[in-house]
């Protein structure tokens, strides 16, 4: 496929067709409150990125508030306990080639996880939070397991005490 270059002086037009149109209402995220900013549950993302750990922001998004020290310690312990991935997920990941894109690997892992650990019929808030926590905890495990298997032929233990 040949690359095309724009004519000299060509400037792409900024689409304004949906400017000012709400794409959806959510308590999780606000975009463009005062320009090109991003807020998670009212907190500026730049402030969070500079002062918070991953698990603190995850807790904010999933549970609605920043955790105190005790809550953060408990949340980290919970996520550690959820790192494991079922044998069926490992088997599916072992079939993926080393050339697979990491996003495709995670999508496949989540699809298999959803089949072997189906959601309950009632989607109450605590149940939905548990699902979000399980996904957050296991996505890294899926990616690491696949990478070590596909690139080194080695199955690794993903249930560790490592931070």
Language model region names:
Residues 2-163:
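Hydrophobic alpha-helical bundle cores within soluble ligand-binding/oligomerization subdomains
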């Amino acid at each position: 496929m040949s690359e095309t270059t724009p004519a000299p002086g060509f400037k792409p037009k900024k689409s304004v067709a949906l400017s000012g149109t709400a794409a959806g209402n959510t308590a999780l995220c606000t975009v463009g409150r005062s320009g090109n900013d991003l807020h998670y549950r009212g907190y500026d993302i730049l402030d969070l990125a500079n002062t918070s750990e991953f698990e603190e922001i995850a807790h904010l998004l999933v549970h609605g508030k920043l955790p105190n020290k005790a809550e953060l310690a408990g949340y980290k312990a919970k996520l550690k306990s959820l790192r494991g991935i079922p044998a069926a997920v490992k088997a599916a990941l072992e079939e993926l080639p080393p050339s697979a894109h990491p996003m495709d690997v995670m999508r496949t892992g989540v699809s298999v996880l959803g089949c072997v650990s189906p959601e309950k019929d009632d989607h109450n808030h605590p149940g939905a939070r548990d699902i979000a926590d399980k996904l957050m905890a296991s996505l890294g495990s899926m990616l690491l397991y696949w990478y070590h298997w596909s690139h080194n032929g080695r199955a690794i233990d993903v249930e560790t005490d490592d931070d």
